[in-house]
């Protein structure tokens, strides 16, 4: 295995050089390393550091006693950065024997023998055998087969990545139903649909083990969904989390969307805005997908660490923090296309909605998306007025 040395943050590792004649080199290498996920890993360092500070303020723990596991480590870059840049004990696991050997080599390169260890086990077996304060599930594809074990092992925070956005977002409907036990819809807000389906699956898995979960930070970036969830033991927390579950109604004729809370509820088929037949997605998470206070703590950690993607990360976290807690965003371009209207600047639209007496905000999902409590008819009136 021919390798090269790369640096992320303050961590130096050896990674395999993939063949030059393949479409997606990272997946063709003997051990997976994707440089495009450095932004994800930078945010992970900041979010984990922020949570560790919370954990140490609440529990009688020393920093070196906090235990983190990366269940799918590959080169070990994610777990090594946590050990070296956050300063907690990191377990890096991978079933691939070449990955296992490379992780051990990279531990030595960084002098982290006292703070890090490599294991070679099936991820579900490891997570059923041991408990960790922070469990990180970042597989190649869907995390669904590992959520039960992850919910069992997580004693403080569960961090989850999903790259199977087509099933999550409704593009591959049956696959999404099989993996997440939820019906997604492929709408203009499909990225948020995927996030809420994933959060709903996590909430249900935690509840099975009499645990609740509270989303601290979630974002959809490029081809993946990423969430950081505080895991809270006890039936009270489990029941409270399930109260944020429900269904989303969508009218393909007029664009109406609305939440219906509850796992066993009566849902009218007719759109309350235009009377047409609606489509239903769920069950999914309808509560907030981030905690503004935690977002501020992550922003502080981003400033404190030397990171290559710092400015991009800060922009994502700031947008997440400032979004309204109203499920399912609108896309200005989709509405403009329906109306035959010209799009205006997104900030101009936000201000016009606020001037009309409504709440409104941008979102991190796209540059043309926004949230508002305005009825769909009022949104269209305002967009038409701005279009002239």
UniProtKB/Swiss-Prot annotation:
Its EC number is 2.1.1.216. S-adenosyl-L-methionine binds at residues 41, 78, 94, 123. Keywords: Metal-binding, Methyltransferase, RNA-binding, S-adenosyl-L-methionine, Transferase, tRNA processing, tRNA-binding, Zinc. The keyword Metal-binding applies. GO terms for biological process: tRNA N2-guanine methylation. It is an enzyme of class 2 (transferase). Zn(2+) binds at residues 251, 254, 271, 274. GO terms for molecular function: tRNA (guanine(26)-N2)-dimethyltransferase activity; tRNA binding. The keyword Glycosyltransferase does not apply. Coiled coil: none annotated. It catalyses: guanosine(26) in tRNA + 2 S-adenosyl-L-methionine = N(2)-dimethylguanosine(26) in tRNA + 2 S-adenosyl-L-homocysteine + 2 H(+). Transmembrane segments: none annotated. Residues 4-383 form the Trm1 methyltransferase domain. PANTHER family: N 2 ,N 2 -DIMETHYLGUANOSINE TRNA METHYLTRANSFERASE, TRNA (GUANINE(26)-N(2))-DIMETHYLTRANSFERASE. Dimethylates a single guanine residue at position 26 of a number of tRNAs using S-adenosyl-L-methionine as donor of the methyl groups. NCBIfam families: TRM1. Belongs to the class I-like SAM-binding methyltransferase superfamily. Trm1 family. This is tRNA (guanine(26)-N(2))-dimethyltransferase. It comes from Methanosarcina acetivorans (strain ATCC 35395 / DSM 2834 / JCM 12185 / C2A). The gene is trm1.
